[in-house]
């Protein structure tokens, strides 16, 4: 804090400098809210000035650019904050950190929105966020190593991989809580995961062969909505090209900072032609999301799986296929799901419905796995469903900062831990 900094350095605070610090704080408060919704790209310096009640030049007296304001907002929350594990009174300490984060106004909203928006390499906070993930991974690995030496982490766990998956699932849980604050809560989920980490990997394997008749799988409820389009083939082809180019723009520039003029210029058509196919940018966004769901392979066909175990073990293949064959669709989903956490975003209801359906479906899948004896009795199907969805989304976000990350390999390792081979 500015006051604390002045006290520590012995700097004498004058009335003018105090007023300046207060104004800077007000600018950062307003910017933080605007960077969450409508988002960094869609927010101008004039928007920030209006929110604070200053002129454009009044803001420029404190910050030279919007980029400088963004970095100041990010630094406000500091670097990765991990206590010395030896000072933690109970457990691994991750629950205490999550509780502390939950008490920081705007933390959840800002970092969830920024994690997706800054994933694009051209974003001014990209390098800071990428470095933050590296810093978090290194510190968390050391933290888990100390915890394992104290008997709080099961023997045989790959600590660096566990640290990476923990950070990814944590990001995903924060995102889920913003869409489904009732069913998903970050702190209890982390507390339950902490108890599971105390067991060796693959604990609780069932003895004997699998059942002759596996438990029935739930009806798939992840299908995209219809986007029925009539008309001539040329018109349908142009509509498809518009959706494809809009997908690329939304993935790289975000929805908020992409205009219909931008889309028209990318496609090479007039705005009137664009509006002939889509009445508004919201309609175009809906078509992009529908096309994404229709093309990507994360909506696994349950009918093709013979059992819950088989279904869950094939998820890694789908993730690898998505990253290799449809990286743009993975990108647009990651960016938009983070951007749309604000309730007034046009895509908020879409992601809220989709997450609710996905959690219900995977809860039923894990219940079937438990009925088959594949999911150990000490694991809760509701928790496992939320953790899997959060992990997958968090891994995709991290993949956008590090394209060498193998999302499929981490999903496979997680499923192997949750569904151990039969003894």
Regions found by a protein language model. Give the residues of each.
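C-terminal peripheral helix-coil segments that are non-catalytic and often amphipathic
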Residues: 1-12, 97, 101, 134-138, ...
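Hydrophobic alpha-helical segments that form the core
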Residues: 4-6, 110-112, 156-176, 186-196, ...
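Helix-turn-helix
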Residues: 22-26, 30-72, 238-241, 245-287
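Hydrophobic alpha-helical connector segments
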Residues: 72, 82-110, 159-163, 301-331, ...
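Short, basic, alpha-helical segments at the C-terminal edge of helix-turn-helix-like DNA-binding modules
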Residues: 75-81, 290-297
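Amphipathic alpha-helical segments used for helix-helix packing
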Residues: 103-127, 325-348
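Amphipathic alpha-helical packing segments from all-alpha helical-bundle domains
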Residues: 105, 123-150, 345-372, 383
